[in-house]
Amino acid sequence: MKIYNTYSRQLEDFQPIEPGKVKMYVCGPTVYNYIHVGNARSVVAFDLVRKYLEFRGFEVEYISNFTDVDDKIIKAAASENISTKELSERYIAAFYEDTDLLNVKRASQNPKATEFIEAMIDFIQELLDKDYAYISEGDVYFRVAKSKDYAKLANKNLADLLAGASGRTDEETNLKESPADFALWKSVKADEVSWQAPWGAGRPGWHIECSVMSTSLLGETIDIHGGGADLEFPHHTNEIAQSEAKTGQKFVNYWMHNGFVNVDGEKMSKSLGNFTTVHELLQVVDPQILRFFLTTTHYRRPLNFTDDALTEAENNIKKIENAYRHLDDQAESNLSALTTFRNDFVAAMDEDFNIANGMTVFYDFVSWVNKGNGGAEVKAFFDQVLEILGIKFEIEQSLDSEIEAMIEERQLAREVRDFAKSDEIRDALKAQGIVLEDTKDGVRWHRE
């Protein structure tokens, strides 16, 4: 199995620290609003990675955090005249509601930043003791000049990174030894949530939170760290700098970053205002369709969010569901053909989780199933791929029985040449969204 490591910009053989086990950390949302489709792309992309690793036999310890203390949370809470805790808990609940509908497997743990404040203070104190950090008027900053290969993850020089970074780097430069230095701790401002530290009251900076939560729960070196491509700098760059300064160990063995969701060629983001929240979208779009849209493009490629793309996803799901519902798990099949499908799917996915190539194999498999191939092993592989994709087809047994009874009644009508009755039953089923297909092997049905 190979993973594209952002740090080296190369495909690398995957060798976990402990054979058979994977320690994985993915940056979660800052919970001041509902997640948008761009956020969901990251959640779904790494859910697919996790599920495929489990399919391949790995035991995955999967950690994804909630940033529940942040400038944006403080501002949003103040605008509603509520506490930051009340605001963040609201949007944590909404996150679970949305991602459950998208069939995202719950993380092994979802730590909150506010649960690790003491550990963050200890982490910062150690950086101060090692002279990697300094105090300036109650703030604590990291000395970037002491960090070896600081800009390597983003594959740019430091000047370019600072010029292209987001507003997260717009800190009080007059308090810093160098404009490149970043905040580990921000001193308290009036009426803001704060905690007491040896250097004064305040709250942690954004970057320190993920370093502390990941190393506290997974150890000093982890196998895989994931997130959106926009996190390469400054967030992940700064995580590496502070973590390796503290521990003296390599922080992450494989860095993975998913591509953006674009609207009219621009990255979907709250700051641009061109975002659609998942909460809103799921009022009008089936969660399965959104999940399929987000899942079936290779995770590193950008996605263009359009109505046509959602329609294509819907049509493809219908084809897959139709094959799945008519798969006869008692049928006989050529198991060597099944083995070929399985091996080809694994070969595609083993190349940096290339689901786009994997889907090409899977669509061929679906066509093969539609030719009458079935059996328990065929159904088992079908189920495994659906699990990786995060797609579930609910089998409505009572409705299926009713439909089968009507089909049988129609067949009897045809045998006695009562075509008016036959057409009446066909029309009644069509009104329920059920389409009949008369084939040489009998009648089949599927939902429109």
UniProtKB/Swiss-Prot annotation:
InterPro entries: Cys-tRNA-ligase, Cys-tRNA-synt_Ia_DALR, Cys-tRNA/MSH_ligase, CysS_C, Rossmann-like_a/b/a_fold, tRNA-synt_1_cat_dom, tRNAsynth_Ia_anticodon-bd. The keyword Cell membrane does not apply. It is an enzyme of class 6 (ligase). Its cofactor is Zn(2+). Keywords: Aminoacyl-tRNA synthetase, ATP-binding, Cytoplasm, Ligase, Metal-binding, Nucleotide-binding, Protein biosynthesis, Zinc. GO terms for molecular function: ATP binding; cysteine-tRNA ligase activity; zinc ion binding. It comes from the Bacteria. Its EC number is 6.1.1.16. Transmembrane segments: none annotated. SMART domains: DALR_2. A motif ('HIGH' region) lies at residues 29-39. A motif ('KMSKS' region) lies at residues 267-271. Binds 1 zinc ion per subunit. GO terms for biological process: cysteinyl-tRNA aminoacylation. It is found in: Cytoplasm. It catalyses: tRNA(Cys) + L-cysteine + ATP = L-cysteinyl-tRNA(Cys) + AMP + diphosphate. Monomer. Belongs to the class-I aminoacyl-tRNA synthetase family. This is Cysteine--tRNA ligase. It comes from Lactococcus lactis subsp. cremoris (strain MG1363).
